Design a protein with these regions (language model features):
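Extracellular/luminal regions of secreted and cell-surface proteins that mediate adhesion/ECM remodeling
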Residues: 390-410
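C-terminal PAP-associated
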Residues: 1-391
Length: 410
């Protein structure tokens, strides 16, 4: 992707397409990500530079009219490294970004100053201790879904650890805590990780290669193994905080492969408290299809919506969604899958939909918006929207009819 454009919610264009280089200049290497900071009421566009992060935030809630505060890759350098596969998250005290790099693999941008357009906004880098990888790293910091922020500090970094990898003895999750001091960076810290044991999983496809899922024609598609998929989401509730995220797993043994989505909800009693696994599940698509490239979030009622890609060796890529109500049986996506979009061609490349993303509409905190890629016939983006929660505030129904005992009601 090399350009961006704004659309109204009805799908009509609100602006012409613009090259990313009009924002960031010549040091622009792609992988753009668009986000909305609900608490600040600002829009964000990011991309990779050759050795830094490009970052633009709208000056107001209308970037078409009022423009952007722009920080190019020189402002936010990444220690001379190309910031491969960046994943951004919004937290109370910073914009956090994980990268597939050696040495420092987590960067934090100074949110308060960036919102004000302050040119002195700074960046801090961290190397997550004891993070084992398969050779490709894609951890994520929790991203705040709505405008209800926790206290500053105690940002949470999450990564899977597969016992199929060297130096990992049992399947588990690792959790790190990051605390930032913008006044004195020497006081900033990332913790040693603690582990959350999980049910067994296999995240390795084809020995770790990028060619995995067989199409009816063309190359095998990258399943995006060893990645916490975009984004790991955080939401506060009156009695607890929740985090939801997912990664792809292989649910067949031997040489046969079927991609499925391993997903989690973690909970903590209050800000800064330890996380525990509240529920985990593995979503397998019907008819033996692959399910991968998923993105999930929670609405204001605690319902989970999940968009994902699906395909097999005879059917091209489709975009679909499923979900669950907050009080449904633990570990199950109970809502029958629904179709968002159907490809009519196959993918000519192995790489596919690295940045599928689901967001919750800030207008009602209920509607899910899912964006991913499909082929019709070439590579295209498709946005789908769905809602699980009812539109009314209170679910009112008849409890009993006391009178008349018989006859017509009027």
């Amino acid at each position: 992707n090399s350009s961006f454009r704004f659309f109204n919610l009805d799908g009509t264009a609100a602006s012409p397409p613009s090259s990313l280089s009009t924002l960031f200049g010549s040091d622009e290497s792609g992988d753009p990500i668009a986000m909305y900071d609900s608490e600040a009421d600002r829009y964000i566009i990011t991309s990779m530079g050759s050795s830094g992060l490009n970052f633009a935030i709208s000056q107001t809630n209308d970037p078409i009219l009022d423009g952007w505060h722009v920080y190019n890759a020189i402002s936010f350098g990444t220690d001379g490294q190309f910031p491969d596969y960046p994943k951004f998250s919004i937290w109370s005290d910073g914009y956090y970004c994980t990268t597939n790099t050696s040495g420092n693999d987590l960067y934090v941008l100074e949110r308060d100053k960036i919102i004000d357009g302050d040119p002195t906004a700074s960046i801090q880098g961290f190397n997550a201790p004891q993070m084992i990888t398969s050779g490709f790293a894609s951890a994520q910091v929790l991203d705040i879904t709505n405008d209800d922020h926790p206290a500053a500090g105690n940002a949470t970094l999450i990564y899977l650890q597969d016992d199929a990898w060297n130096q990992v003895s049992t399947d588990h999750l690792k959790i790190w805590t990051i605390n930032i001091d913008w006044e004195n960076p020497n006081n900033s810290s990332i913790s040693t990780p603690y582990q959350l044991p999980t049910s067994s999983f296999t995240s390795v496809f084809d020995g770790g290669s990028f060619a995995n899922l067989t199409q009816s024609s063309g190359p095998d598609i990258d399943a995006m193994q060893a990645c916490i998929m975009n984004q790991a989401q955080f939401r506060k509730f009156p009695t607890h905080n929740s985090a939801v995220f997912n990664f792809v797993v292989d649910v067949l043994s031997g040489s046969d492969e079927q991609a499925a989505v391993r997903w989690y909800e973690l909970r903590q009693d209050s800000d800064g408290e330890p996380w525990v696994i509240y529920q985990e599940g593995t979503y397998t698509a019907p008819a033996g299809r692959h399910a991968f490239g998923a993105s999930m979030a929670m609405d204001v009622q605690g319902n989970i919506g999940m968009g994902y890609s699906s395909m097999n060796s005879t059917n091209p890529i489709t975009l679909r969604y499923t979900g669950r109500y907050a009080n449904d049986p633990s570990g199950q996506m109970t809502i029958e899958e629904n179709l968002i979009g159907q490809s009519n061609a196959t993918n000519p490349n192995t790489r596919y939909a690295d940045y599928s993303q689901i967001s919750v509409d800030p207008a009602n905190d209920k509607t899910f918006w899912f964006v991913s890629e499909y082929f019709k016939p070439g590579r295209r983006d498709l946005v789908g929207t769905f809602q699980i929660a009812a539109n009314y505030a209170n679910d009112i129904g008849v409890v009993s009819v006391d009178t008349p005992v018989s006859g017509l009601l009027s």
